[in-house]
């Protein structure tokens, strides 16, 4: 008479491997979604920081700076309002925006920059702001851009 040796059958091993594969796939998907939400939160925080620097500049100078460039500073003379204008986190999470960099434009009235528009792109709805290209102005951050 043969004695059964303790161990696992091939079917049991395949079932366990399939379950482990499924769990790892689900965790990777959840991790990627969390990373995308984190990048959107960072984009929104960057825009709010840029707005704060622009408003401090406006309070001191009576107009907004005529240009800002990611990687440069917002400064006037010896006063630095923002050391480095942030670049958006990569990768871009929304393909409908084209260039995902923050785009700054000013409205000139009597050669003074009296208003600005700061365009930014979100990959998903964040803090009530829809995915896609949005515009921040002195009035707020959640204005939808007209395309």
Q: Where is each model-derived feature located?
A:
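Aliphatic-rich helix starts adjacent to a transmembrane/signal segment
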Residues: 28-48
